[in-house]
UniProtKB/Swiss-Prot annotation:
UniProt subcellular location: Mitochondrion
Presence of keyword Mitochondrion: yes
Main location: mitochondrion
Annotated protein name in UniProt: Putative uncharacterized protein YLR415C, mitochondrial
Residue interval of the organelle targeting sequence: 1-21
One GO CC annotation: mitochondrion
Keywords, comma-separated and alphabetical: Mitochondrion, Transit peptide
Annotated source species: Saccharomyces cerevisiae (strain ATCC 204508 / S288c)
Length: 112
């Protein structure tokens, strides 16, 4: 299942925020089961993963916030090529778990 929802990326010094731009926002329906952040410190190195359960990062307003490690903050700050980082959302839909990768671009984040 592919979703057409778009996300907007906002990076601050302490956290990453992904806000749903779809109507209604997917986050408000608590469809996300977990979020896996994945990236490398340098091209060619093994990927480092961090998984967080959605119940601990999704707010009532539909905003997903996470506090990644400094490795991910460096990646998100644009110090490395964006192709070396991605986030994977695990969604529940009609009792079926669907995997939808998210690719970061310089503009809005788009479900692939």
């Amino acid at each position: 299942m592919y979703l057409s929802a778009q996300l907007m990326r906002t990076v601050t010094a302490s956290h990453l925020t992904l806000r749903a731009l779809s109507t209604p926002p997917l986050f408000q329906h608590r469809q996300i089961a977990a979020v896996e952040w994945c990236g490398t410190t340098r091209p060619g190195l093994a990927r480092q993963k961090r998984t967080q359960h959605a119940s601990s990062v999704i707010s009532k307003s539909g905003v997903l916030s996470a506090k990644p490690s400094s490795v991910f903050l460096a990646l998100l700050a644009g110090k490395l090529a964006e192709k070396y980082i991605y986030a994977r959302m695990l969604l529940f839909h009609v009792s079926v778990v669907n995997e939808c990768p998210v690719v970061f671009h310089s503009g809005p984040v788009v479900w692939k």
